């Protein structure tokens, strides 16, 4: 409605004798309105690593790129940064994928483990206690993650696949709490099928390994 009003006003003014298009553009109220429109538009999207503009609440699947996911997750820290040393979401996802490999899981489950936190590169992570108070956030997060699975796996996860991904993710969480925070829970530590090493890798190496696993298992 605002844009139509501006265009109508533009025709009115520019049509008057003695008012050129250049003079119209320099009028203070026109500069203010058009600048405000630009800010409103920019506030509706984020700019990704590869230069795409994505609206996290209404994403276009065609703009979701694995390069953006791998890059962003390699730079995001687990636990909102409340860890003894830096540990990226990308490293966590790679470990989940490797645990799935070690268990002999299907290529789909390996990829799902790799991508299970992919929504965080567009929406950021929210601590679980706070997330429980934000039902709309959880709805949007679930919608975006389903879209990512459908794009890269061909379809959403089955219940059995989702249960296995959640189990592996929870197992890694328990080890993260122990190693990165020194925090133990009442749960018995589950068995790991992979060798877990919390050595921090350079961001670029994490990004490249993420992409290697994705490429390898996308072909299976």
Q: What residue ranges belong to the model's regions?
A:
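Cationic, low-complexity basic patches in intrinsically disordered or flexible, solvent-exposed regions
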Residues: 3-4, 24
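Extreme N-termini of proteins with methionine-enriched Sec-type signal peptides or N-terminal signal-anchor
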Residues: 7-8, 22, 38-42
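Compositionally biased, low-complexity repeat tracts
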Residues: 11-17, 47, 77
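Charged/polar low-complexity intrinsically disordered segments
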Residues: 12-18, 22-26, 34-35
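Metal-dependent phosphohydrolase cores
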Residues: 29-220
């Amino acid at each position: 409605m605002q844009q139509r009003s501006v265009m109508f006003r533009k025709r009115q003014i520019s049509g008057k004798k003695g008012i050129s298009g250049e003079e119209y553009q320099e009028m203070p109220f026109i500069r203010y309105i058009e600048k405000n429109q630009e800010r409103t538009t920019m506030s509706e999207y984020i700019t990704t690593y590869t230069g795409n503009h994505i609206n996290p609440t209404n994403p276009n699947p065609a703009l979701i790129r694995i390069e953006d996911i791998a890059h962003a997750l390699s730079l995001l820290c687990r636990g909102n940064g409340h860890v003894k040393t830096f540990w990226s979401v990308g490293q966590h996802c790679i470990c989940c994928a490797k645990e799935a490999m070690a268990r002999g899981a299907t290529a789909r489950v390996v990829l799902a483990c790799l991508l299970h936190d992919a929504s965080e590169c567009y929406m950021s992570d929210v601590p679980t206690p706070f997330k429980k108070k934000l039902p709309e956030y959880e709805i949007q997060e679930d919608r975006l993650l389903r879209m990512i699975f459908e794009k890269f796996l061909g379809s959403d996860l089955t219940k059995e696949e989702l249960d296995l991904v959640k189990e592996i993710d929870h197992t890694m969480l328990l080890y993260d709490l122990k190693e990165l925070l020194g925090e133990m829970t009442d749960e018995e530590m589950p068995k790991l099928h992979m060798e877990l090493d919390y050595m921090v890798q350079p961001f670029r190496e994490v990004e490249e390994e993420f992409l290697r696993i994705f490429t390898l298992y996308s072909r299976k």
